[in-house]
């Protein structure tokens, strides 16, 4: 799994919001990320929403802590991080066709241009990057 430095939350063009570890937070986090309006490309927005959903769902199910979603625009790159307070690193699992879970990190890997994990003093940030197709 790729590793990288934590997201620089002090950059201009950076927004963040905390969410409770509840199932409704997945849709709220998707709306938060898309509301930034940093892409007007439908495919990019679908990829953003899908990968955010997967990472937030993992935080809700596995970390079970309040989590922070940070969105940074740097040039033509949109970088999103989901930071939780669990030190347990995500594990990409093999899955069976009929299993309802286990596909999340496979989806992240397929849709994100880059992704990884940054270990924090407390917890971790799972992040991904997408290149903007069109400037909003």
Kindly give the residue locations of the regions a language model identified.
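Conserved short strand/loop->alpha-helix "switch" segment adjacent to the catalytic nucleotide/phosphoryl-transfer site
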Residues: 27-53
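Conserved beta-strand-loop-beta-strand hairpin that lines the nucleotide-binding pocket
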Residues: 1-16, 60-136
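Short, well-structured hydrophobic secondary-structure segments
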Residues: 51, 56-61
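Histidine kinase transmitter module recognition
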Residues: 36, 40, 58-59, 118
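STAS-typified acidic loop motif
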Residues: 16-30
């Amino acid at each position: 799994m790729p590793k990288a430095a934590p997201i620089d939350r002090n950059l201009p063009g950076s927004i963040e919001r905390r969410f409770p570890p509840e199932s409704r937070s997945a849709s709220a986090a998707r709306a938060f990320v898309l509301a930034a309006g940093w892409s007007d490309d439908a495919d990019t927005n679908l990829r953003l929403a899908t990968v955010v959903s997967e990472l937030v769902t993992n935080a809700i199910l596995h970390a079970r802590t309040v989590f922070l979603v940070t969105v940074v625009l740097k040039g033509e790159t949109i970088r999103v991080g989901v930071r939780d307070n669990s030190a347990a690193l995500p594990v990409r699992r093999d899955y069976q066709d009929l299993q309802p879970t286990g596909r999340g990190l496979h989806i992240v890997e397929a849709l994100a241009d880059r992704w990884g994990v940054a270990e924090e003093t407390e917890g971790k940030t799972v992040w991904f990057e997408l290149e903007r197709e069109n400037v909003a």
